[in-house]
Amino acid sequence: MGAASRGARYLRWAIVAAGLAAMVWGVRQTGMRPPGPENGPRPSSPPAAFGPTVPAPSQPAATPPVGMVWVPGGEFSMGCADPRGIPFGGNDPMPDARPIHRVRVAGFWMDATEVTNDQFAAFVAATGYVTVAERPPRPEDFPGAPAENLVAGSIVFTPPAEPVPLRDPTGMAHLRWWAYVPGACWRRPTGPDSDLQGLGDAPVVHVAFEDAAAYARWAGKRLPTEAEWEFAARGGLSGAVYPWGDAFRPGGRWMANIWQGRFPGENTAVDGFVGAAPVGRFPPNGYGLHDMAGNVWEWCADWYRPDTYLGDAGPDGRAVAVDPRGPADSFDPQEPGQPKRVQRGGSFLCSDQYCSRYIVGTRGKGEVASSTNHIGFRCVQTP
């Protein structure tokens, strides 16, 4: 474990000891604090317009792997225009999703749904794997922390009983709806008194980045790059706002599992789900992929930097990035010492009131050792 990661984890556990774990976790995560003017790069010129998505003339060479669909690859415009002002676009300008730039990816197989509890349980049964949330922290990794406070657990959404001002100028509103719960993990998603009964087809949650990567290796797969994920999420559409098109609710139908009601205390669940939905309950996109918006965040392989797209676009903004794998390291100016990977798709907690990252071109980020009850993943496979 590197010094930066070790220090970050010690700080998290030290604050757990003080009963304020959500403070550390919350500011590490996308959508958990109000946007600010320094949240990302400032392109020197207006973002390019979306160009057409041009699928590659590729066909899968074999029978589809179980539970996977073919994503043909091709060239597309990656990124997101400032969503403020569009219906349900939210209040965040999303500067790290610009400039919009051209990207080309090769074809690949992708899980049609997020990895489920049943699938993850099969992995654990076969390997004996223990997730980050289930591991008691080692004293040598957290010098000075009282032994009684080195307790395994994870972060759980806990709606407050009273309204919360989402635009709190202190940036600490999120402390009101996240709680560190000892014993919470993928097997016990809301704490030690919970279990997975009836949740076998729900997406596995409370998985840190290394947990997702370990499952992918066992399954003979890998985590998608950010470019692969966005190409797949767009489903062949060119510059659409959502994986299914530009209308938020076409024909009045809910197309994704996101928050309804006043966030974070009132969840009207008019889409039928209070938390994560069983996978595949909402319509697929053009490539046959379900839940590419909402439900649970999905880990990608790339390190996170807010200026990644500036490099991919080239000096004149006209470059075509071919199968980009992301930057060599992580840097988030909000938290320079925290190593973060990209997360995509948003979750059941996303709302235009606070986190509109169900918009297909927007980006998320997560500290690599963090796990919560709204973070999961899906895998890809190179043919």
For the regions a protein language model found, what residue spans apply to each?
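Short coil/turn motifs at beta-sheet boundaries
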Residues: 370-372
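Functional-site microenvironments in short loops/helix caps that host divalent-cation chemistry
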Residues: 41, 70-71, 77, 81-83, ...
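Short coil/loop residues immediately preceding or within conserved phosphate-binding loops
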Residues: 66, 100, 105, 199, ...
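Short, compositionally biased
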Residues: 2-193, 210, 342-343, 367, ...
